[in-house]
């Protein structure tokens, strides 16, 4: 049983990271679909099963895994953040995908600076997040898991609004992704940037295709 004392170390770190990854944190995560909107518009993602398969591909083989590796690299002592920022840009794959990670990273850095945390330098989102998380008393696998969970949550939120899915079905998808999140989090702690590879080609192509949509709800 807790004695009521607040642990400013690990507990404080978990609370701060959860705050940064919360939908309430002003990085406008709700405005991005990562190309999912294009998949839905063209009928390639039609229901909850399609959504779950698409998101799992992003987590295991796409930007989820890749960005987690970049983020953990930014957490390391002496990390070259400018180099990692350039790498994140090279990995983005399309204009909108780059804008998504660039703008969210800039918003994260600016908000943290306004809170008295961080230098306010605008960097790609996984780099900005990793640099901030490096100051927390948290294990790398915990940071990776919470980050990947937030990726899943943001994409499910987009699907709930646009497929549309019911709220309960959306939460079943989030719960069903816990295995993928745990697997990838355990993997990436042993990875370096040399281990980066992407094979979520459908998601990458959808992100490019989204640029040509005449009517859209999401920025990407």
Curated annotation (Swiss-Prot):
Primary localization: cytoplasm
InterPro entries attached to this UniProt entry: UreF (IPR002639), UreF_sf (IPR038277)
Superkingdom classification of source: Bacteria
A single MF term (Gene Ontology): nickel cation binding
Keywords: Chaperone, Cytoplasm, Nickel insertion
Recorded GO CC terms: cytoplasm
Signal peptide: none
Keyword Chaperone carried by entry: yes
Subcellular localization(s) per the UniProt record: Cytoplasm
Pfam family, one: UreF
Oligomeric and partner information: UreD, UreF and UreG form a complex that acts as a GTP-hydrolysis-dependent molecular chaperone, activating the urease apoprotein by helping to assemble the nickel containing metallocenter of UreC. The UreE protein probably delivers the nickel.
PANTHER family, sorted: UREASE ACCESSORY PROTEIN F (PTHR33620:SF1)
HAMAP family in the cross-refs: UreF
Primary role: Required for maturation of urease via the functional incorporation of the urease nickel metallocenter.
Family of this protein: Belongs to the UreF family.
Protein name: Urease accessory protein UreF
Organism name: Jannaschia sp. (strain CCS1)
Gene: ureF
């Amino acid at each position: 049983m807790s004695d009521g004392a607040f642990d400013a170390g690990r507990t404080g770190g978990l609370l701060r990271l959860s705050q940064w990854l919360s939908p309430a944190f002003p990085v406008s995560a709700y405005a991005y679909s990562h190309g999912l909107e294009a998949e839905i518009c063209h009928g390639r993602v039609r229901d909850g099963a399609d959504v779950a398969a698409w998101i799992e591909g992003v987590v295991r083989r796409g930007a989820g895994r890749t960005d987690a590796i970049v983020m953990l690299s930014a957490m390391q002592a002496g990390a070259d953040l400018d180099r990692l920022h350039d790498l994140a840009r090279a990995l983005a794959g399309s204009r909108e995908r780059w804008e998504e990670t660039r703008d969210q990273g800039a918003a994260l850095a600016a908000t943290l600076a306004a809170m008295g945390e961080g230098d306010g330098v605008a960097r790609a989102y996984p780099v900005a997040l990793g640099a901030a998380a490096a100051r927390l008393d948290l294990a790398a696998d915990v940071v990776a898991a919470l980050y990947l969970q937030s990726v899943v949550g943001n994409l499910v939120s987009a699907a709930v609004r646009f497929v549309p899915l019911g709220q309960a079905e959306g939460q079943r998808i989030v719960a069903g992704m816990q295995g993928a999140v745990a697997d990838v989090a355990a993997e990436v702690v042993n990875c370096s940037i040399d281990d980066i590879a992407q094979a979520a080609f459908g998601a990458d192509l959808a992100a490019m295709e989204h640029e040509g949509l005449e009517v859209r709800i999401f920025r990407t």
